[in-house]
Amino acid sequence: MKIYEGKLTAEGLKVGIIVSRFNEFITSKLLAGSIDCLKRHGAKEDNIEVCWVPGAFEIPVIAKKMASKGKYDAVICLGAVIRGATPHFDYVSSEVSKGVAHVSLDKEVPVIFGVLTTDTIEQAIERAGTKAGNKGYDAAMSAIEMSNLMKVLD
């Protein structure tokens, strides 16, 4: 039996990161977590490129653009969608997750879903670097592992 796994080294990896400007007080912490993870695992700062978009809904189209270029080993998508009093949360959360998954499958590039979908601001803050860890860091770990696994399987 053969078992395949991706290494947890970012040396030589080129990573694109897309960050939603909406809820920037949260997303900037997710971005910092992603960059910290990539650098701790050997990525060079010159191999990390960041695109800011207005909101989470705009993430998939830029993910598609970045994944289509063929220069990124992975694309990390970061955002924070927080439930409000209207159904807007449900529409945005659903479409962003579908869009990100579609791009990854279509382009065969790891496109990592690091978009927080929380009921409260407090939950988002917890997931952006306090008691629930930093989901931006976690998304970068997934990007590293998946990028290396894709290389093993090529």
UniProtKB/Swiss-Prot annotation:
<dbReference type="Pfam" id="PF00885">
    <property type="entry name" value="DMRL_synthase"/>
</dbReference>
<feature type="active site" description="Proton donor">
    <location>
        <position position="88"/>
    </location>
</feature>
<feature type="binding site">
    <location>
        <begin position="85"/>
        <end position="86"/>
    </location>
    <ligand>
        <name>(2S)-2-hydroxy-3-oxobutyl phosphate</name>
    </ligand>
</feature>
<feature type="binding site">
    <location>
        <begin position="80"/>
        <end position="82"/>
    </location>
    <ligand>
        <name>5-amino-6-(D-ribitylamino)uracil</name>
    </ligand>
</feature>
<keyword id="KW-0686">Riboflavin biosynthesis</keyword>
<feature type="binding site">
    <location>
        <position position="113"/>
    </location>
    <ligand>
        <name>5-amino-6-(D-ribitylamino)uracil</name>
    </ligand>
</feature>
<dbReference type="GO" id="GO:0009231">
    <property type="term" value="P:riboflavin biosynthetic process"/>
</dbReference>
<comment type="pathway">
    <text>Cofactor biosynthesis; riboflavin biosynthesis; riboflavin from 2-hydroxy-3-oxobutyl phosphate and 5-amino-6-(D-ribitylamino)uracil: step 1/2.</text>
</comment>
<feature type="binding site">
    <location>
        <position position="22"/>
    </location>
    <ligand>
        <name>5-amino-6-(D-ribitylamino)uracil</name>
    </ligand>
</feature>
<feature type="binding site">
    <location>
        <position position="127"/>
    </location>
    <ligand>
        <name>(2S)-2-hydroxy-3-oxobutyl phosphate</name>
    </ligand>
</feature>
<comment type="function">
    <text>Catalyzes the formation of 6,7-dimethyl-8-ribityllumazine by condensation of 5-amino-6-(D-ribitylamino)uracil with 3,4-dihydroxy-2-butanone 4-phosphate. This is the penultimate step in the biosynthesis of riboflavin.</text>
</comment>
<dbReference type="GO" id="GO:0009349">
    <property type="term" value="C:riboflavin synthase complex"/>
</dbReference>
<dbReference type="GO" id="GO:0005829">
    <property type="term" value="C:cytosol"/>
</dbReference>
<comment type="similarity">
    <text>Belongs to the DMRL synthase family.</text>
</comment>
<keyword id="KW-0808">Transferase</keyword>
<dbReference type="InterPro" id="IPR034964">
    <property type="entry name" value="LS"/>
</dbReference>
<protein>
    <recommendedName>
        <fullName>6,7-dimethyl-8-ribityllumazine synthase</fullName>
        <ecNumber>2.5.1.78</ecNumber>
    </recommendedName>
</protein>
<dbReference type="InterPro" id="IPR036467">
    <property type="entry name" value="LS/RS_sf"/>
</dbReference>
<dbReference type="InterPro" id="IPR002180">
    <property type="entry name" value="LS/RS"/>
</dbReference>
<feature type="binding site">
    <location>
        <begin position="56"/>
        <end position="58"/>
    </location>
    <ligand>
        <name>5-amino-6-(D-ribitylamino)uracil</name>
    </ligand>
</feature>
<dbReference type="GO" id="GO:0000906">
    <property type="term" value="F:6,7-dimethyl-8-ribityllumazine synthase activity"/>
</dbReference>
